[in-house]
């Protein structure tokens, strides 16, 4: 009798994706982040669903409803903080996943890579709208500042902003629609993630060496299921420590002040995971230029396959490119730090230099380094 998992229409899909999937035998812990992102997404959808049962998307009651969740709902505080810090874990995993893709040349799977970029944009949009929902000071002013960036678009900008706001300022209509979008987008992300996997399984996984692994594959279960479970346990451990010991570590204290359109906070800044992009936006003294730089800071990933000049796929055996990659990581950490600082000397200059370096590394230095490495190896 044939095994049900190989014959049943539904089980067959699960089997070919998570059980009998032929996987390279040498993939490292950097390949764990895909499954961790899946866990983060499920966690966010579940905690978000329970929060939505008690949340009200009205400007007069939104802040109070979040307070009510934390004070009066059974385990409401833990659900709220799991959701808030779960977003931070989500982005840590996302950035490491993208970094892995850059380091090991996974962007040569162009379909998978492009769906990944769309996923990144969608998750960022979802997180931004979620940050507006508690209706604290940073929620309100963050929404005002970021949506206002669209007014930099020539000719249609102002109309576009007012259309998104549903009025002449961020108000009740804005909050209601942001809640609607924040609820629906994670399911869009779920569908896109399925497409992401579909494209990945067309080609099979990349591996640290960057060479084809067709001759050396092992089944996903039990080898990588056990490895993924270890990764998941570590993720849950870090998240639990964060939620139970310092739930507000990554948040902004200003968001505990109810939104007040008449009082601007001294430093408007987004959540920590957007600070690098915010620093790039602020480093350009022109509104439209800043918005373009902001979009390009992520969209630049789409041209990575075109900028790949090396004869090797990954960076495992390319020391010059490795140095540049880690310089890029340091640069992004610098931008993250600058994004949280006030707009004054010396932060302005540091931010501008870090922004220039970011684009320089990706567009100029890495392709040149690859050519140099090819020549050293006489390839």
UniProtKB/Swiss-Prot annotation:
Q: Which InterPro entries would you find in this protein's record?
A: Cyt_b/b6_C, Cyt_b/b6_C_sf, Cyt_b/b6_N, Cytb/b6-like_sf, Cytochrome_b, Cytochrome_b_C_euk/bac, Cytochrome_b_N_euk/bac, Di-haem_cyt_TM
Subcellular location(s) of the protein: Mitochondrion inner membrane
Q: Where does a ubiquinone bind?
A: 201
UniProt record, GO biological process: mitochondrial electron transport, ubiquinol to cytochrome c
- What GO MF annotations does this protein's record show? metal ion binding; ubiquinol-cytochrome-c reductase activity
- List residues binding heme b b566: 97, 196
The residues the record assigns to binding heme b b562 are 83, 182
GO CC annotations on file = mitochondrial inner membrane; respiratory chain complex III
Report TM segments.
33-53, 77-98, 113-133, 178-198, 226-246, 288-308, 320-340, 347-367
- Cofactors: heme b
The topology of this chain with respect to the membrane is: Multi-pass membrane protein
Q: How is the cofactor bound?
A: Binds 2 heme b groups non-covalently.
**Which keywords does UniProt give here?**
Electron transport, Heme, Iron, Membrane, Metal-binding, Mitochondrion, Mitochondrion inner membrane, Respiratory chain, Transmembrane, Transmembrane helix, Transport, Ubiquinone
Superkingdom to which the source organism belongs: Eukaryota
Question: What CDD domains does the annotation carry?
Answer: cytochrome_b_C, Cytochrome_b_N
Additional information = Heme 1 (or BL or b562) is low-potential and absorbs at about 562 nm, and heme 2 (or BH or b566) is high-potential and absorbs at about 566 nm.
Q: How does it assemble?
A: The cytochrome bc1 complex contains 11 subunits: 3 respiratory subunits (MT-CYB, CYC1 and UQCRFS1), 2 core proteins (UQCRC1 and UQCRC2) and 6 low-molecular weight proteins (UQCRH/QCR6, UQCRB/QCR7, UQCRQ/QCR8, UQCR10/QCR9, UQCR11/QCR10 and a cleavage product of UQCRFS1). This cytochrome bc1 complex then forms a dimer.
The record's section on PANTHER family has: CYTOCHROME B
What does it do? Component of the ubiquinol-cytochrome c reductase complex (complex III or cytochrome b-c1 complex) that is part of the mitochondrial respiratory chain. The b-c1 complex mediates electron transfer from ubiquinol to cytochrome c. Contributes to the generation of a proton gradient across the mitochondrial membrane that is then used for ATP synthesis.
Q: Which family does it belong to?
A: Belongs to the cytochrome b family.
Q: What is this protein called?
A: Cytochrome b
State the organism of origin: Pusa caspica (Caspian seal)
